[in-house]
């Protein structure tokens, strides 16, 4: 499994709200494929509903001190994350791969399950400890 880590830096135009910058970045092209907007349209027709936090972002925004510090934000892409549905005993785990016309379905399945394995082990350990 190859993992991508990127640091993206830039300067926001004053007329663009900080939240608009974050909204434009998610879901990232590394999760959707390219061209991003068309791919998101296709995903919306194929998947039964929204992905929730999976492929979204978790992070923070700071406003700065208004003089020298401009503020900023730092977000990560949510992958291999377990989401617990309160009171139900259900846990949801998103995992995926980059499927292309040349993909091998068995290989993609194996990659997806490999990516999910560590989180599944943690869930099982919690279940056994309960």
Each model region followed by its residue ranges:
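Conserved hydrophobic core element of enzyme catalytic domains
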Residues: 1-130
């Amino acid at each position: 499994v190859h993992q991508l880590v990127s640091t993206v830096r830039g300067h926001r135009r004053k007329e663009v709200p900080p939240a608009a910058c974050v909204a434009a970045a998610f879901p990232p092209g590394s999760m959707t494929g390219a061209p991003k907007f068309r791919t998101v349209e296709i995903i919306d027709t194929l998947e039964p509903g929204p992905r929730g936090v999976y492929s979204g972002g978790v992070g923070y925004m700071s406003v700065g001190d208004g003089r020298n510090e401009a503020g900023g934000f730092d977000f990560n892409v949510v992958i291999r994350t377990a989401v617990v549905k309160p009171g139900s005993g259900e846990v949801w785990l998103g995992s995926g791969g980059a499927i292309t016309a040349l993909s091998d379905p068995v290989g993609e399945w194996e990659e997806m399950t490999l990516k999910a394995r560590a989180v599944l082990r943690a869930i099982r350990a919690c279940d056994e400890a309960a």
